[in-house]
Amino acid sequence: MVDEQVAVEHGTVSHTISREEDGVVHERRVLASGERVEVFYKAPAPRPREGRASTFHDFTVPAAAAVPGPEPEPEPHPAMPIHANGGGETKTNTQDQNQNQTTRARTNAKAEERTAEMDDTMASSGGQRGAPISADLLSLSSLTGRMAAMAPSWMKSEVCGERMRFKEDVYDGEAETLAEPPRCFMLSFVFIYYCCYLAFLALLAFGFNPLFLPSFMPVGAKVLRGKGRDFGVPLSYGCPTNPFCKVYTLIPAVVINNVTYYPNNTDSLGGHGGFEAAALHVAALFESGCPNLQAVTNRNRTFNVTRASGRVERRLVQDMQRVLASAVVVMHHHCHYETYYVFDGVGPEFGTIPTPSFKDVLAFRPSLVTNCTAPLKTSVKGPNWSGAAGGMKRKQCRVDRLTDRSFPAYLEEVMYVMVQ
């Protein structure tokens, strides 16, 4: 379909022919000077109202075809001198050169006049009759349109002249509501990423750092010491400061003749040593079946050790035998304190010590009298607890022992073994 329009603007008569199938506008303009000019350009697409980017097609107009005019006349060849017959006048090429320069000046003046009139006509129409006829501008508009068409849905924009306006800046109620970029998701992802990164650094700095590994490790078999020497220095090689006084040792104290012998080699009279001899005395009486052994639990229940009949009482007696025998082995061989904790190891590959019994520890003193009323022989001396171990007080050991029920949830344990 072809639309024809005739308009008179400022003395300029324009005849416009537009084709809807391709949007090309063909204008034939008659200037005030009487000269006819033909102009071809492509009408701009209407501004989209649904929020979609405009799509442009390539359409370039050669600069020579934008404002066609009379072709410049070819420059005449230099005229050859003509000699008149009979010695007439001679015509030089100076006159021809002057004539060519005059013609060229007139042509340039007409071209400048046509260009000025075209600019005035486009300015008076407000730029609404068509897009700029420059080939460079048309190519730039086509490139801008393709870029807008390839953008994501949330970045779709409207092209307004030479400026691309994103949908975030458009406040048009009729425009399509486009999805916003997931800013909250991106921020949360970055936050979680950095938290995991910091946790990984902390794990490397502390969890896998050998300087922060626990000092306790299975020491293998017995770490023997020469007799008369001190035990290992507390806190070195994993030695606890209060040996056998922690809740997880569960080593009962031994009461003989109203004197209490504590697992840290102290007694209620303020003396040092004697716990190994007291434990061996209890082992000898138990193996002889003496009825004068009484056990006191943390629940203030008292029962006979050799005549225990209930399920709980038998379990308490077995635990009492195990821990007393283990303590005697550690003290007799001058082992490090932590050796006590590897009696129940995972296997022989770690060099663990088999859990001893009363019969095993009685082999240390085969001449021990098995009389139930025999007094305690203190000839067996414990190791020297002077120096770093001197700060271990009976009161502290008595308070710490079996008062914390958090490891593990023991129901009842033997706190004292009394020889009556």
Curated annotation (Swiss-Prot):
Keyword field: Glycoprotein, Late protein, Membrane, Signal-anchor, Transmembrane, Transmembrane helix, Viral envelope protein, Virion
Topology in the lipid bilayer: Single-pass type II membrane protein
Positions of glycan attachment: N258, N264, N300, N304, N371, N384
Chain segments annotated as transmembrane: 185-205
Virion surface side: 206-420
Any GO CC annotation of this UniProt entry: viral envelope
Domain of life of the source: Viruses
Entry annotated with the keyword Transmembrane: yes
Disulphide bonds in the chain: none
Region of interest: Disordered: 1-21, 64-129
Keyword presence, Cytoplasm: no
Family: Belongs to the herpesviridae BDLF2 family.
Job description of the protein: Rearranges cellular actin to increase intercellular contacts and thereby promote virus cell-to-cell spreading. Induce the outgrowth of long, branched plasma membrane fronds to create intercellular network for virion traffic. The fronds are actin based and RhoA-dependent.
Domain notes: Plasma membrane remodeling is mediated by the cytoplasmic tail.
The name this protein goes by in its record: Protein BDLF2
Organism from which the protein derives: Epstein-Barr virus (strain GD1) (HHV-4)
